């Protein structure tokens, strides 16, 4: 990773786990940060994946509900960034739908895209390559999975490995 390249960390976080990692990454590389925000925010009840009537369960079972309307898909000063970190929680083995919605709408051009995810128990799976397939452009790098309680040291070690 070019330490002189201007970077941004873009993330969606339903329960602050991904936000914590995103904030740590941004602080360590002096990057800007942009939160992906659905117009209709997810509540704790919405996120109850064991409840077949919860919002995420309905969205999981009906893909037509997975195109989430976002407050903004326009990242300020987008053209200035060379490197983009994209963070998301894992939902049903893939990236959270608000991230998918953003990735489908943004032109990444020749930017370097570095995905990262958080999960209590699921792995990265193919979420990084699935996002690449949904994007129209970008130089996508392999993703990295953090546990939801990853330490600052784990984040710093990963950044150093890039």
Language-model segment annotations:
Residues 109-112, 138:
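A short helix->loop->beta-strand "cap" motif at the edges of active sites that frequently abuts
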Residues 101-108, 135:
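A glycine- and small-aliphatic-rich helix-loop capping segment at beta-alpha/alpha-beta transitions
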Residues 1-83, 93-95, 100, 104, ...:
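N-terminal beta1-alpha1-beta2 submodule of the flavodoxin-like/Rossmannoid cofactor-binding fold
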Residues 88-89:
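Glycine-rich, N-terminal phosphate-binding loop of Rossmann-like dinucleotide-binding domains
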Residues 126-135:
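Short, aromatic/basic amphipathic alpha-helical patches
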Residues 33, 136-145:
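Short beta-strand elements in bilobed, periplasmic/extracellular small-molecule ligand-binding domains
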Residues 117-122, 148:
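Short beta-alpha junction loops
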């Amino acid at each position: 990773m070019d330490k002189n390249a201007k970077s941004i960390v873009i993330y969606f976080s339903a329960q602050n786990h991904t936000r914590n990692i995103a904030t740590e990454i941004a602080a360590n590389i002096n990057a800007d940060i942009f939160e992906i925000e659905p117009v209709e925010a997810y509540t704790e009840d919405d996120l109850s994946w064991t409840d077949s009537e919860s919002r995420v369960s309905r969205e999981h079972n009906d893909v037509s509900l997975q195109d989430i309307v976002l407050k903004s898909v326009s990242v300020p000063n987008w053209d200035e960034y060379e490197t983009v970190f994209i963070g998301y929680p894992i939902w049903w083995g893939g990236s959270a739908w608000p991230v998918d919605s953003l990735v489908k709408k943004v032109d990444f051009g020749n930017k370097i895209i570095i995905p990262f995810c958080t999960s209590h128990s699921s792995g990265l799976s193919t979420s990084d390559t699935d996002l690449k397939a949904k994007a129209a452009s970008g130089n996508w790098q392999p993703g990295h999975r953090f546990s939801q309680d990853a330490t600052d040291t784990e984040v710093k070690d990963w950044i150093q490995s890039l």
